[in-house]
Design a protein with these regions (language model features):
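N-terminal signal peptide c-region/cleavage motif recognized by signal peptidases
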Residues: 16-18
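N-terminal alpha-helical modules
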Residues: 3, 20-130
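Bacterial N-terminal signal peptides that target proteins for export
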Residues: 1-9
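Sequence termini and other peripheral, non-core segments
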Residues: 12-14
């Protein structure tokens, strides 16, 4: 048990160092591969924020789920999120396909996915604040 308690801060430190190095490298990426890695990192951050916002909202609706309308609201949220995931995927695939060939073509897909994730995060947070 004592060993694992010591490893947690070490792992956090290693991860923080890695994240800082990635952020620094993304300030001025100079190759296509670096540009794509940076956009993947930005997408990962946006996805984490989106998932956290969704879990918070779904959890709040679950906790308040004593009334029929609250249970229905949670069920509708789950359905809406599944539909949104499918919409986002198709929308970004369409953009990717429309770009034809090119080394930065994947960037358009990643950027589209990130933009949608950021917008959806704001929508979920607004849902919670209303």
């Amino acid at each position: 048990m004592a060993v694992s308690k010591k490893l947690v801060p070490l792992a956090a430190l290693v991860w923080a160092s890695y994240a800082m190095a990635q952020d620094e490298a993304c300030k001025a990426p100079d190759t296509t591969a670096a540009i794509l890695r940076c956009e993947e990192l930005r997408l990962r951050h946006a996805e984490q924020a989106l998932n956290a916002a969704y879990r918070r909202l779904a959890g709040e609706l679950q906790q308040r789920g004593s009334e029929a309308h609250e249970r229905e609201a949670r069920a509708l949220l789950v359905k809406a999120q599944r539909n949104w995931v499918a919409f986002r995927e198709q929308d970004c695939k369409a953009l990717f396909t429309a770009r034809g060939d090119g080394s930065l073509r994947p960037w358009y897909y990643l950027n589209c996915m990130r933009s949608h994730a950021q917008l959806r995060t704001k929508q979920l947070e607004t849902f919670r604040s209303d």
